[in-house]
């Protein structure tokens, strides 16, 4: 935040993490108060320091919150949210984040301050290791009208958050907690519609995996539809193979989508996949899960493609595929 006063405490707070590639935040001096005396400015600076020390201090101090009166709590909430930099310095501190979460939900009047600060800095707090939990807590304890406005922001920035190191973790927490049917379906649809992009992303793939674990049949089918034709490519990758395995475990249409992708690729590619570090798990799981009467056509389709190259698969020590093929008597 731009500030006319020169007061700086950067030496005390030089451990604060960078936020979205900005310089590390420091506790700035209070905004200019026009005709206020130097005494008033210095007092405001001391108040900020006291708030910071309390909020980021030892865990042993957190019990002190319960003995604070309403007026003091309101003063604290107002002061720590009066400037974006003040707020971020506290929320990006591990203890500061935990203490702030304890203050949230104590009164609607206090929550107004916290809500407005979060909304002003939404992307910043959602992509920080500790500050993101402040937003998550707000979505748990704020009144419905405030939560809905926060949900709207989540929908707007879902893909961006999914591709961020800490944003993806926060997004997964929110997906787990979200109990509003409308917003839940909207968020799952965003993940499903962007499944290919997210599955190939270093962090986004964790969101796709998380959503598949929820076993929401509609969303799982939508993800399978978006990944149709790309399952082989994903199976060569560590985290991509996890997503493909989740689709196989879902059974029905998602499983058929994966196996048909395997059968559609060239034989050379299929054998290379079956011998690869991650792909062999996908092929093995496809064989294990389709070896039932209802999916026998898929199973024998794979077996017939792989059987002539069984000798090559024996050379892959990690693979159980050759063992499965050896145990089979494929009908003519």
From Swiss-Prot:
Molecular-function annotations in GO: RNA binding
InterPro entries with a match to the protein in the record: ARM-like, ARM-type_fold, PUM-HD, Pumilio_RNA-bd_rpt
Keyword annotations of the record: Cytoplasm, Repeat, RNA-binding, Translation regulation
Any Pfam family the entry gives: PUF
Protein location: Cytoplasm
Chain ranges of the PUM-HD domain: 1-329
Keyword Repeat: yes
Residue stretches of each Pumilio repeat: 82-117, 118-152, 153-188, 189-225, 226-264, 265-300
GO BP annotation list: regulation of translation
Signal peptide limits: none
One cellular component term from this protein's GO annotations in UniProt: cytoplasm
Keyword Acetylation: no
UniProt function note: Sequence-specific RNA-binding protein that regulates translation and mRNA stability by binding the 3'-UTR of target mRNAs.
The record's note on its domains: The pumilio repeats mediate the association with RNA by packing together to form a right-handed superhelix that approximates a half donut. The number as well as the specific sequence of the repeats determine the specificity for target mRNAs.
Listed name of the protein: Putative pumilio homolog 16
Organism name: Arabidopsis thaliana
